[in-house]
């Protein structure tokens, strides 16, 4: 038989009917072409620029490469995997010799394309990089051992197999009409060009491999096969909700933010700085809370999208709670921007499905009944809601971690980067990250610029060295010596650097009172003595928050229903609406306690099960936020969850000593809004807890949360002060503490300790910075450099939701291992979600979607040693492993004891306190 007949006999998908290999290759190429034709002109221009070809030629070239992703299936190893298909291939004249051990087809794809692309005329380096990229379409490039095993097979292979593969490659190029790109200078393909093909191959394959979208059995010999495949591809993208790009018309600020009567100085500076921008830019906004940074960033996105043709927006925040809080605001903005058109918007973090606003968008995107029109406005299509695909949606709100996974070699990291390509990426609260995460952030900024994206970086506070590192990561050169003006400021880095200083929205003088007695009992008395009013206490650890809540006194558990009754009903803003919606089903849940004098006391931290934490967060925002009824006597005890992005407003605030930037963040929760206040709280006052002996270790454990030196330096800078100007004093204090690190300036009794703690801090910073450089794609040319230290992650073959303790540290945050658990109560012989034994936990058999969601809503992440280490050794129930929602969770029986040496603790779940560790 002929080479053509042999090649056409090869199969890609088994079954009756089967799907020929050439057919699947053309299907995948068609999806790639259809995707690119729906993308903005600027995305297509990037592909053309990558390869030095006219636009149509560049798209055909990229699509042809994508089609070749499965060329490795044209191998005896793969074709022997289905007996019926193997017999057909043998009848077509392709012999099977001795088959050695199994090798994944992606490994063969790389080896085959290295040779064939060079034969085609591509320079060796470009051919090798593209071959490795296309071979990685299932998540990872091949490692040396895999390639060695594959080469052993090739040494005994019949030459007809090579001819069949060469015919397939030429046929794909012929059908697509794909030209060869002109030789690129040094013979290399730029890393961003390789990534654009690499990612497109992966997700085009996901679509083309769905038999409900691309039925098997279609004959690729037909002359109109590619035309039909393009029709199916377009229909598939329409069904999945892939949006066609619509050019944005420039709108005025007031049209998009009608609730703001007049833009402030920050918001007015954005269009002025962006005027004339013709290339992607970095916009750095340094300003305190309350200056409208979010609206400024969203308006910057609109102007950049209208001016440069960016494909969409991703807003990255430090926590799930902050992402949840911003999601409805971004949705409202996009719907005003879209004026009724359909917009694909995803909420991207691990517990997004618990968010009622996001659940509503998933419902809106569900297929309509016959005769029903599709709804306009924001929707969340199910296809994009899958973890690996969410970043492909043009609009998203989520955690920074979801973006940072793009610069770590987790499975399909390159798909995330493609999703961020030619987009406006807003990075909020960048002051909240450690040195390691900041190193990953710098790598992300380098990639965003290379991929044609713009970035808006927002921060309340930033030490000069951190600011410089971020600006230089984008600019690719030193920006030392640039006069950026005083704080608050906006800095634009484009073809040059421009900066504009702003008048603060308000200058608040906060009275500062230091409490040297930090034990919870006297602190509780001090807080109660400050009533009436809305009093807040932000402490540094969950254990301390629980202890302070207890010390405030015995009380009656406060249910949601009782809270509504005491307030005379539920009305007000968004947070109150969430509380109102929860009332019918969750009215009996405990959200706090009532003291004998009528004081309402609330507790908020991260050790509540997810649904309880979310409900408590809504209650806290409703009671201590901007609108709605405000109880006359209320105390909130919280951890750091209250210092980031939550619009809280206290009459009086206590805080444990923390780094100076975080103290300013916390002080921003004082007198945030104009409202009547008790006379004794007419002026904002901050109570600062500093232990008399300056011992931040056991039993406070503040040194486990913050660096000893930074706490000492913050205290040294604040001692003797009785007031703070917010934000007026911020920049000078930041410079003194973070840039003027000089232990010799400390009092004699602290000097040696300061020297030791500064040395430890500098060593940790160096370690974290080096770790970030090693493990991330810190430079673009490390995309396929799997021989270097960054290959550690690839060698682990990490999923991006990996739960193994030994590999967690390689992800986006350094720190102690943790595990997400579902607390279960033993009642009789069974395990239940509730202590009364009404909701049995599904541990065997199949788990329905409703059961999985119920378990997921009860999850809580724990890190107390040795709990994660022990639980991560245990296999989750088999049914949980099959569920995308549950596979990272472990069941934890309440009351279980964990031991480490002579220490032991028992895990309990208290309805008021959350997860508690009791010594035994």
Curated annotation (Swiss-Prot):
InterPro entries reported in the protein's UniProt record: Cas3-like_dom, Cas3_C, CRISPR-assoc_Cas3_HD, CRISPR-assoc_Cas3_HD_sf, DEAD_box_RNA_helicases, Helicase_ATP-bd, Helicase_Cas3_CRISPR-ass_core, P-loop_NTPase
Domain HD Cas3-type, chain residue ranges per copy: 14-207
Effect of residue 205 to A: Loss of endonuclease activity
Gene3D superfamilies per UniProt: 1.10.3210.30, P-loop containing nucleotide triphosphate hydrolases
Cofactor note: The ssDNA endonuclease activity (residues 6-260) is stimulated by Mn(2+), Co(2+), Ni(2+), Cu(2+) and Zn(2+), but not by Mg(2+) or Ca(2+). A Ni(2+) ion is seen in crystals upon soaking.
Enzyme Commission numbers on file: 3.1.-.-, 3.6.4.-
Residues that hold ATP according to the record: 287-294
Resulting phenotype, residue 138 to A: Loss of endonuclease activity
The keyword NAD is annotated on this UniProt entry: no
GO term, biological process aspect, one: defense response to virus
Alphabetical UniProt keywords: Antiviral defense, ATP-binding, Endonuclease, Helicase, Hydrolase, Metal-binding, Nuclease, Nucleotide-binding, Plasmid
Family annotation (SUPFAM superfamilies): P-loop containing nucleoside triphosphate hydrolases (SSF52540)
Motif (DEAH box): 428-431
PANTHER family, per database record: CRISPR-ASSOCIATED ENDONUCLEASE_HELICASE CAS3 (PTHR47963:SF9), DEAD-BOX ATP-DEPENDENT RNA HELICASE 47, MITOCHONDRIAL (PTHR47963)
Free-text comment on this protein's domains from its UniProt entry: Proteins of this family have an N-terminal nuclease domain and a C-terminal helicase/ATPase domain. In some CRISPR/Cas systems the domains are swapped, in others they are encoded separately.
Function: CRISPR (clustered regularly interspaced short palindromic repeat), is an adaptive immune system that provides protection against mobile genetic elements (viruses, transposable elements and conjugative plasmids). CRISPR clusters contain sequences complementary to antecedent mobile elements and target invading nucleic acids. CRISPR clusters are transcribed and processed into CRISPR RNA (crRNA). Cas3 plus Cascade participate in CRISPR interference, the third stage of CRISPR immunity. The N-terminal domain (residues 6-260) acts as a ssDNA endonuclease, has no activity on dsDNA.
Protein name in the entry: CRISPR-associated endonuclease/helicase Cas3
Origin species: Thermus thermophilus (strain ATCC 27634 / DSM 579 / HB8)
Organism lineage string: Bacteria, Thermotogati, Deinococcota, Deinococci, Thermales
Gene behind this protein: cas3
